[in-house]
Amino acid sequence: MKKSVIALVVVAAAGGGLYFANMQAENAIKQQLEQANQSYRDMAADGEMPEISLSYQDISANVLTSSYSISGLAVAMGEMGTVATADIVQMKGLQPQGLSDSGSVKISGIKAAAAVLQMLPPQTSAYLQGLALHGDYDYAYTDSGELMFNQQTRINDEFALNYSFSLAQMQQFWQFAKEISALPPEQQQALAADEAYVGQMLEKLATGALKNGAISIENNGFIERTLALMAEQGQTPDFATAQGLALANIAVIEQIPADMKQSLSDFISKPEKLSLSFGFTEPLQFAKVQSGELAEHMVSPEAMIKFANVKLTAN
């Protein structure tokens, strides 16, 4: 019996401790949002930007999984009121104050608010009202100095822009970033406007190198639908005419290799997916780019394409 009571006490204490830790994490995020709003108010008062403020419906945190979420996020701008909303922002591996070696952010359901829609022509307003923007971002840093990050931005299920990059020799930059992120938010905001800080950051970044990367566009009717609306309003030619003009322009560009021209032409003729990738035999050191040591590889588009081993494929 005593053992059961002790076990219950331990479980209750652990549960209470977890609840308190989660509440503290939620309060830290709320404080950061309020500090961001105060910073926006200060900059608006100084005439540096319009008056912007952030609000939310709910914030939750789970310190065991290092995950946080902000529901019902809204962005307001001065007298216009709410201009954009997001259903939910989910973060994992991120710290309210500090920089973890891996993390991710997912934003779902970004939409234009009524204050924006009512300012637009009826057709444009109806079109924009049917669009929802979604974003996924993640990064990872390893002890070997490699930093990898990926992002996907989607519009409904009609369009996606994806990219991923891998960098090397990022130890100095990452250490600098960790030190800065450990500072209080107000101190970080002050440093962002400090030229000396920006110079230090660029100096640390120059010690790194770019290994490889990829960018892709996926289209499922979004380009056609957007051009149709713009053509209806007299802003652009119709889709078929725009296709013809684009194909004619590609045909006369001499600096692009024939296989890349073909890929571009294939995508324009049937806009489904266009992918570009590159990778260096040895990581491209930013310091060498700055110093001009790699000038021989930058003399022409052809030289750059060969140096970076650029590949372009369609559909």
Q: Where do the model's predicted regions map?
A:
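Glycine-rich, small/hydroxylated-residue low-complexity segments
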Residues: 7, 12-315
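Positively charged n-region of N-terminal signal peptides that target proteins for export
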Residues: 1-4
